[in-house]
Design a protein with these regions (language model features):
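Short, cationic-aromatic polyanion-contact patches
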Residues: 3-6, 59-78
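Pre-recognition alpha-helix immediately N-terminal to the DNA-recognition helix
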Residues: 8-13, 25
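Short amphipathic alpha-helical elements of helix-turn-helix/winged-helix folds
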Residues: 12-17, 29
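Short acidic, hydrophobic short linear motifs in intrinsically disordered regions
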Residues: 20-30
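Short, hydrophobic-biased segments on the C-terminal half of alpha helices
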Residues: 42-46
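Glycine-centered, phosphate/nucleic-acid-interacting loop/turn motifs that mediate DNA/RNA or nucleotide
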Residues: 52
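Short beta-strand "wing" residues that participate in macromolecule-binding interfaces
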Residues: 56
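Amphipathic alpha-helical dimerization/coiled-coil segments
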Residues: 77-122
């Protein structure tokens, strides 16, 4: 399932809050920082409903929205898509790119080394 950048802002509100949220709550949490109007957020909610990324249930005169798509699943799909598009699905070139272009701290390097050691142990 492909989620646009704007839709991901709405999803982040639902993931962060965890409990079902009203449209008004979502507007209040997302719209000001993005410069959006209420109608924009409602449009994004409708798109997410059609994609079955969220569900809505009636609560009196309003609807409460909750995430169906788990954040971990979304992050995994987006990460895989980026890796496939830019690096042919290979992690090595991604790490090489970041090590060449970004200032990796000693902590970053230690975390990468620890991850590689853990992966190496798991493969044995």
């Amino acid at each position: 399932m492909r989620i646009s950048e704007a839709e991901s802002v709405v999803m982040e509100v639902l993931w962060r809050e965890q409990a079902p949220q009203s449209g008004e709550d979502i507007v209040a949490a997302a719209a000001p920082a993005q410069g959006w109007q209420e109608a924009t957020v409602k449009t994004l909610l409708n798109r997410l409903l059609k994609k079955k990324a969220i569900a809505a249930e009636r609560d009196g005169r309003r609807y409460l929205y909750r995430a169906l798509l788990k954040r971990g699943d979304y992050v995994h799909a987006e990460s895989k898509s980026l890796l496939d598009r830019l690096y042919g699905g290979r992690v090595g070139p991604l790490v090489a790119h970041f090590s060449e272009r970004m200032k990796l701290t000693r902590k970053d390097i230690a975390e990468i080394k620890a991850l590689i050691e853990e992966l190496d142990r798991d493969k044995r």
